[in-house]
């Protein structure tokens, strides 16, 4: 038999090979059950139980592929493993309960048949109706369970079939499906060519950036005024915090940092002012720091410049004042916004890492 120019067999030639093979092995085409190449009892194509050392021509009980195994061409005839002592199933643990435990995975094969398993079909799924290559032919094929797709023992794939693309391994990244003519203006959507409301042009912020607790905002206008570093004890400021000294618990949830939280009658100052002494001195001097502009608050965390000067050259952080500590990098927080726990820039992230080492001497 000659091959065509492409070097592959045509359909017709494949069928020729089939015919030769079936003639050799005395298989009755109409019999979908297991048949055996050798003894004369098999000539009628009657279903036979396999002896241990015999080969099965077809393990398929699917009438569509009647006498033909998926690899029944002469070049691909399945190679059989030596029948060896059956390998015991994996020990049952909590995480791997064994194949017998889960009904979707089928039952364990009979111990005698485990040596007889085609090497070519080793780990793959068996054809739809077959349990094991040696299952008794009269038995019913396993029913299709609603929970599992495909032949039992194959991995269960969940989810709508439109996610599965034929050419891609499951879990591989594929480009997202495109919108029809996207950036073009669609008059039905409204007059705006790119309305970011409708289609997000930029993806939502990654979850660690989104404030889990909303950013500190003032509930009342009075409270907002009290939030500024204005030591003027106005009625509004005193009223906004509920009249009590100490902390506004609606505020940040900061505990009163240092000094006494201030008594009722005393002028209301922001909670994080360094100490009662400074507060008293400011009271007596009457020299008051200017109210900071709204714009500068992000950088200074709501502290006025005067306070920073008095803070012994410390950080612009409400948490921790005092002289700068070079090697305790965590003592000051360079966080840009209160709600995100990320470092401010790559520089500070780099400074947090291990300090560079001295080159070791080759000794």
UniProtKB/Swiss-Prot annotation:
Residues 56-75 have a biased composition (Polar residues). Residues 100-116 have a biased composition (Low complexity). Residues 35-262 are annotated as: Disordered. This is Putative uncharacterized protein FRMD6-AS1. It comes from Homo sapiens (Human). The lineage of its organism: Eukaryota, Metazoa, Chordata, Craniata, Vertebrata.
């Amino acid at each position: 038999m000659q091959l065509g120019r492409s070097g592959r067999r045509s359909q017709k030639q494949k069928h020729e090979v089939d015919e030769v093979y079936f003639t050799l092995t005395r298989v009755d085409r109409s019999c979908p059950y297991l048949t055996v190449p050798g003894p004369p009892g098999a000539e009628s194509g009657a279903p036979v139980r396999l002896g241990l050392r015999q080969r099965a021509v077809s393990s398929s009980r699917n009438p569509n592929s009647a006498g033909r195994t998926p690899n029944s061409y002469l070049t691909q005839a399945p190679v059989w493993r030596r029948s060896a002592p059956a390998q015991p199933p994996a020990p049952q643990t909590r995480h791997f309960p064994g194949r017998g435990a889960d009904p979707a995975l089928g039952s364990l094969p009979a111990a005698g048949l485990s040596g007889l398993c085609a090497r070519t079909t080793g780990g793959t799924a068996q054809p739809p109706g077959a349990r094991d290559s040696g299952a008794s032919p009269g038995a019913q094929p396993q029913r299709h369970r609603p929970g599992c797709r495909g032949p039992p023992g194959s991995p269960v794939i969940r989810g709508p079939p439109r996610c599965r693309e034929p050419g891609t391994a499951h879990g591989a990244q594929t480009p997202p499906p495109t919108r029809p003519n996207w950036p073009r203006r669609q008059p039905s959507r409204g007059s705006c060519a790119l309305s970011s409301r409708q289609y997000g042009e930029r993806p939502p912020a990654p979850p660690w950036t989104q404030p889990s607790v909303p950013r500190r905002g003032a509930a009342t206008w009075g409270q907002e005024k009290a939030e500024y570093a204005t030591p003027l004890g106005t009625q509004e400021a005193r009223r906004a915090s509920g009249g009590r000294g100490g902390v506004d618990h609606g505020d940040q949830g900061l505990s009163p940092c240092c000094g006494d939280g201030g008594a009722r009658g005393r002028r209301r100052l922001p909670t994080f002012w360094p100490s009662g002494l400074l507060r008293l001195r400011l009271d007596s001097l009457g020299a008051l720091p200017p109210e900071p502009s709204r714009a500068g608050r992000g950088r200074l965390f709501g502290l006025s410049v005067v306070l920073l000067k008095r803070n012994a050259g410390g950080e612009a952080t409400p948490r921790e004042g005092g002289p700068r500590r070079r090697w305790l990098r965590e003592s000051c927080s360079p966080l840009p916004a209160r709600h995100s726990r990320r470092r401010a820039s790559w520089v500070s992230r780099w400074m947090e890492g291990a300090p560079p080492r001295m080159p070791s001497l080759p000794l």
